[in-house]
Amino acid sequence: MVFPQKSKEKLRYLKDRWDDQVAKSLDEAELLRYRSNLLGSDLRITNFGGGNTSSKIEEKDPLDGNKATVLWIKGSGGDIGSIQRKGFATLYLDKLHAAAKRYRGVEFEDEMVDMYPLCAFGNNTVAASIDTPLHGFLPFAHIDHLHPDWGIALAAAANGREKMEEFNRRFEHRLIWLPWQRPGFELAMMLRQAISASKGCDGIVLGGHGLFTWGETQRECYLNTLTIIDQLGQFVAQHVEEKGNVLFGGTVSAALENQRELAIDIFPFIRGRVSTGQRMIGSFSNSAEVLRFVNSAEAQRLAHLGTSCPDHFIRTKIRPLFVAWEPSSMLNGLREKIDEALKVYRDEYKQYYDSFAAPDSPKMRDMNPTVVLIPGIGMFSFGKNKTEARITGEFYTNAIHVMEGATALGTGKAHDVLPQAGPAAKTEAFAVHENYVALPPSEAFRIEYWQLEEAKIRRQPPEKELSRRVVVVVGGGNGVGEATARQAAERGAHVVVADRDAEAAKKTTAEAQKIAGKEAAMAVSIDIRDREAIREAFREVIATYGGMDILINTAAIFPSSPDGVIQDGQWGTTLDINVTANHRLADELAPILREQNLDGSIVLTSSANAVVPKRGSEAYDVSKAAVSHLVRELAISLAPKVRVNGISPATVVKGSTMFPRDRVIASLTKYEIKFDFKATDEQLRGLLAEFYAKRTLTHCPIDPEDCAAAILFLAGPESRCTTGHLIPVDGGLTEAFLR
C-alpha cells in the first residue's frame, strides 16, 4: 500500500528523486539498483555501507526452465549508494526457506551463513549479506532496511517504543517495535512472527538498530521508505528544537577561533599516537554539530557509553577517545592529556576484549581509537585510507545525531524496563544516560568480533607496499616527479603533487586519482625558494591527511648559458634551488616527523654530473655534488627514525622541463645529430636521449619511469636498512662509477 501522506509536497527534509522516464526503461533488477542508489545518495537516509535493499523477482530457472522466485539482495560489504547490478547476491527463495529447517537456535547462528551459497541462483558468487533471511522471510516483494539517524534516535531512546506510538498517532502509521537482536536467523524469525501477529503494519523499528519498510512495487517501496524517514525527521527535529540550547547539558567549552590552526598543529602528534599498531590516515571535522557535541557538558559521558547502531561501531569502535582538555588558544598540556587518555583507552579496550572473547574469537585488533574528540577543536578520525578516515568521521557524526535525537525525545522519566531489552540482553545490560541507550558491551563485542565481520576483513585485497603512507612529491608536475607520483599511486600511497606550476600539478594529480581514487591524491602549490610557502604547503597536507611520511624532491634547474659563462645571479639561484631548497624541505619536514614518531623517508635527486665534470655546467654540477653530500649529512642528523637517500641519474630528456626545445636543438646541433625542424618536442628529445644512451654500457635511454622506480625503492620499506646512500640510474656511465 502507499500511504495517503505520500507526495513531493509532504516531504519536508528529503527529496523524491525518482524519475519515471528513467525507471520505465529498467527491468526489475535494474529498478532495484536504481532504488538503492537513490536511497544511498542521501546520508540522512542511511550511512555509507549501511542498510540493505532487496527485491523478490520471478525469473526463469536456468536448470529446468520453470519460473523461480529469486531474492536479490545487496552483497555483503556493499554500499547501496554505489552498488551496481553485479553487486547483488541472488538466491532461490524456496531454498532459503528450506534452510530455515536446519536452524538449531541462536547459539548456532553463524553456521547458517554456510547455507547461503547453497541457495545461490545461477552462477552468482556474490557473498550474501547477513541480513539475507531478514528480507527473505518477510512476505513483501520489495524491502528496505536502513539506518537513518532519525530512526536510530527513536530506536536508541529509553522511551523509544512509547515515542513510536506517539509518532504513529501523529502521522497515521502502524510501525511496530522489536527489541534488540543481532542480525541473523534469530532476528529473521522474530520479524516473521511480528509481521504475522501485526497485520497491516507498515514498518518495523528494530531497537538499537534501524528501520524496515517495504512496498509491493519498487516505486511504492521507495516512497514508503522516503515518507516514513522524512516524517521521523519531522518528529525528532521538533523535539530537538524544543530542547534548544540545553541539549547535551548545554555548552561548557567555547569553540576556539583558531581551531583549524590548532588542529593542524596537533594532528601529526595524534596520528602518530593512534598509529602505534598500524599506520593511519586522518581526517578532521569542526562542523557545527561536532563542535556543539564536543563542547557540551554531557559529551564525555555520552561518548564513553558507546554507540548504538552496529554499523557505527564497526568503524568507530565501541567508543571514541574523548580528551578532557580545557580549551585554550595554545596547546598547553594537550599532548600530555592525549597520552594519558590513550593509556586509559587502550587498557579499557584490552579489558573489553578479554571480558568477552571466546576461544574461537578473532585475535584482538588494534587497541587504538579511530575517533578522537577534543573540546574547542573538533573531531579527528582515522582509517587505512582517506576515504575510510572520512567515513569513520561521518559515522561518528551519525552517532552524534542519534544521541542528540534520543536525548531530545527524553521526558526526564526513568524507565525500569527498556524497550530494547529482550531475549538477547536484559535491561540491566544496557547503559543509559539522558534517555540515550547504548548497546551492552557484550553485544557490541559480538558484532565487532563476529566471524562474519572477520570474513569481510579477510576478503579485502592485500595492502600494497606504500599503503597508509603519505608521499609528497616536490616537482611532481612533470618528468621524473610526474612518473614518481604515478608509480607511488600504483603502490598504494596517498600522493601529494607539489609543484610551482599549478596546472601541471593538477594534471599529475588527476592521473594519480585515476589510479588510486579521488581522495588518495591532492595537489599543492609550492615554491621551494620560500620557506613560508613550504610550510604552508605542508600544513595543507597535514590538514588533509593528518601528517606526512615520505618526501621526494625532483625539482631542479639547469641554468642556460649559451656563451658558456654563468652569471653570478644564475650561480646563486642554481645553488639555492638545487641545494638549499632541499635543506629547507628537510628542515620543515623534520618537526612533523618528530611529532608523529613514525618511520619516515626522504629521497633527493642528485645527478651523474655530481662526479663527472663538464664544460659549461659548473653551477649545475657543483649543486648536484652538494646534494649528494647533503644526503649523507641529513641521514646522520635525522637518524634513527628518518632515512635519507638519493638517486644519481644520467641525463633524463623525456618529459623534462630542463630540456626545452631550444636547448634540445642546441645539443643536437652540438653533437652533429641530424633532425627535422618540423619534429615535435618529444621527437627531438627522443633523438637526444638515444644519443646519450649510446654512451652508456647498457645503451638504454634513461626514462623518468626508471628514476621513479629507484626513488620509490629507496622511499619504501624494501630498503628499510639503507640510508645515506645514492643509487646511480645512468645506464652504466663508467666515469660515474662509485669509487
Role assignments for model-derived ranges:
Residues 607:
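Residue(s) in the substrate-gating loop at a strand-loop-helix junction
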Residues 564, 612-618, 699, 717:
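Active-site loop immediately N-terminal to the catalytic Tyr-X3-Lys motif
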